[in-house]
């Protein structure tokens, strides 16, 4: 048998294909992380010749129809945000569900993603604040009609904000605009980002826990934001030059610290549950309420 650049790496490719990963860029990235020296063409050819390894699609997407005018904004004017839900593989061979918070600058495409065990409002606030630290605070956020943001609309169609979210907007200093009901494609950039996270970042990867997942996600965001995109450029450079002059720096006030540190009840045996893990505290604090914040690599 002849020897090629893929010799010794076909096992990795086969496992990716069996997991449904057919994106050549993703496969090439995984191979290069293991020492592969070849290019994308040979990887594409291998994928095309081994389509029988790819599991069949479970359903086909129906035609979406006319989506109206393209939504455009100025530099630093608006970010889009949304939740996505997916499963992540651990090194223990288990799968667990996570909520993916995604935020993207509508003008330049700079992106930020973070993962949480669920999509509760306290996690929405933490994800938004981390996104604002990463990209600055825009004039307004574009999102859909999630219950943690808006209760309902009045007879004139004006939103009735959820009271805690309304206070959060005042504290941070931004406004919120909502998509029309059943028109999620208005925020198509963040919808595509969530799909890209699932198909690119998560494809074929395993993580120890949510902390390991978020550290890897931040590195991935840095990589994507400093990569040249045809027709756009380098998002990070554009964001600094144009959007950074409009978006304001997040002021770490004492009021914001309360959003970073949600309350937790200390159990009778001296443990605090946070993000699916238990942390021990001195036994004398049992039954009391504490505030917990994720920091660094903890």
Where are these regions (language model features)?
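RNase H-like two-metal-ion nuclease catalytic core shared by retroviral integrases
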Residues: 143-144, 155-156, 176-198, 213
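Short small-residue beta-strand/loop micro-motif enriched in glycine and branched aliphatics
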Residues: 109-114, 150-151
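Mobile-element integrase/transposase regions
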Residues: 4-19, 29-41, 45-111, 119-126, ...
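Acidic/histidine-rich, metal-coordinating catalytic segments
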Residues: 137-157
């Amino acid at each position: 048998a002849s020897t090629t650049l893929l010799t010794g790496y076909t096992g990795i490719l086969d496992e990716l294909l069996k997991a449904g990963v057919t994106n050549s860029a993703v496969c090439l990235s995984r191979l290069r992380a293991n020492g592969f020296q070849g290019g994308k063409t040979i990887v594409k050819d291998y994928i095309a010749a081994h389509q029988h390894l790819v599991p069949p699609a479970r359903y086909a997407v129906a035609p979406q129809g006319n989506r109206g005018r393209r939504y455009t904004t100025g530099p630093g004017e608006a970010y889009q945000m949304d939740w996505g839900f997916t499963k992540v593989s651990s090194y223990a061979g288990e799968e667990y569900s996570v909520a993916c918070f995604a935020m993207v600058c509508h003008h330049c495409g700079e992106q930020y993603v973070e993962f949480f065990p669920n999509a509760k409002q306290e996690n929405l606030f933490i994800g938004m604040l981390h996104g604002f630290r990463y990209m600055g605070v825009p004039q307004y956020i574009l999102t859909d009609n999630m219950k943690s943001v808006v209760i309902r609309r009045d007879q004139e169609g004006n939103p009735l904000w959820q009271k805690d979210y309304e206070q959060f907007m005042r504290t941070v200093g931004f406004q919120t605009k909502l998509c029309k009901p059943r028109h999620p494609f208005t925020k198509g950039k963040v919808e595509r980002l969530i799909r890209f996270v699932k198909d690119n970042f998560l494809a074929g990867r395993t993580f120890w826990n949510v902390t390991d997942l978020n550290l890897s996600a931040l590195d991935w965001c840095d990589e994507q934001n400093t990569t040249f995109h045809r027709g756009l450029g380098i998002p990070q450079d554009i964001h600094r030059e144009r959007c950074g002059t409009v978006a304001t720096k997040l002021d770490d006030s004492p009021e914001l610290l309360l959003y970073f540190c949600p309350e937790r009840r200390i159990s009778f045996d001296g443990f605090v549950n946070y993000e699916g893990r238990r942390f021990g505290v001195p036994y004398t604090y049992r039954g009391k309420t504490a505030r917990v914040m994720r920091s660094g690599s903890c």
